[in-house]
Amino acid sequence: MLNNLKSGFVKKLSTPRKTKTWLLILLGLSILLICSIIVSIGVGYFPIPFSTVIKVFLTNTPGLKSLFYFPISSTETALILQIRFPRALCAALVGAALSIAGTAYQGLFRNPMADPYTIGASSGAALGATSAVILGLGITFMGISTRPLFAFIGCLATVLGVYSISRVGNKVPVQTLLLSGIAVSILFGAIVNGYHTLFPDKFRQTAFWLMGSFSYTEWIDLWSALPFIIGGSIVIYMFTRDLNLLA
């Protein structure tokens, strides 16, 4: 009886300590992320000092304009706020989304090495995007490219196809799902390489995009991707308990 009370008391003490530790870790990582974004903004063909980046943010932040004013050229201000800042934010946002998606895959397949390549999701997205460009469907509508839409369609169709192939009766064995995904991923990768050989000029339009380049990222790209990333993250968070049980 005494041992049970003691263990319960220790658990109550350890829970707040763990929570406090995790909060401190998250705070430290958040500060590190902000610093890395600021540093990355100053790196490029036209280098900008760290202090100048800070001054631009202080001068252009609502509520701080009246408190801070620094004589900064309009060229540096435009370069930071209109070109490099959206790229840095989009890179951080995409990195967070990939981390969340990777965690979900690892929990779903009970494998710490699982990733979007496991069931062909990435190769399906690449095939959808390149097919859109090759067929002349990679247009821009209201300032937003349709390539991400076709990439999403290709990804979703591939996942559903792999799931259907792997289904045995009313069950989907994890091993069969993984093997089917790897096979489909190799097949679609070969098709994308075939596009590169047969249509080199058109493929060049999407080559850097497939490698994850943020060279042409603008604010509209960030705002168009934000709802999908937040929505997907919320859905995954709602199934956190189920993923923990699977893992």
Model-predicted regions and their roles:
Residues 2-247:
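Alpha-helical transmembrane segments in inner-membrane proteins
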